[in-house]
C-alpha cells in the first residue's frame, strides 16, 4: 500500500527537499501554507501530515488542530527550528502531535519517524474499524436480546394459559 503524505512548509527549499526525500516511497502532496493544506485535505486522503511549526498566517499546531475535524485518523509530525516549549508540550500531551523533530533534521531519523508514524496510523485505523464493528455487534446483540426477552414473555403467557386452574372452585363451576 502506498501511503499519501502531506508536507506543509512556507519555505520552498524545505518543501522541495522533503518531497524528494519521500517521493520514492510515498505519494507526496505539498502545501506552502496552512490554508492551502486545509483545502488540499478536502481532496486527498492523507495518512500523515508533516508540518513546519513557524509559518506566517497559521502555525503548524493551529493547522493540526483544524485538521482533526477533516482527517481524524491522520498522524501528525511537527518540524520546528524554534522551541516554543509550552505549545509543543500541550500538543504532545493532548495527542494532537505524534512526534516533533527539530530543524535541521537528520534524513534517516525523519524516514524512521515517518515509517513508525505510518505503522501508528495503521493501528489507529484498525482500532477505529474494530470499534465501529464492536458498536454494530453490540447493537445487534441488544436486538437479539430484546427478541429473546419477548419470546420468553410469550412462552410464559402461553404456559399460564395452558396450565390447569389451581383453584378448586373453577372445577366446580366448569362441572
Task: Annotate each predicted stretch with a short phrase.
Residues 30-39, 60:
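Helix N-cap/capping motif at the beta->alpha junctions
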Residues 9, 52, 80:
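Active-site residues of response regulator receiver
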Residues 83-86, 105-114, 118, 122:
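C-terminal output helix
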Residues 15, 56-57, 80:
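The feature encodes the CheY-like receiver
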Residues 62, 83-100:
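Alpha4 helix (beta4-alpha4-beta5 surface) of REC/receiver domains from two-component response regulators
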Residues 6, 44-50:
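Active-site beta3 strand of CheY-like receiver
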Residues 3, 12-30:
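Two-component/phosphorelay signaling modules centered on CheY-like receiver
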Residues 129-175:
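C-terminal output/effector regions of signal-responsive regulators
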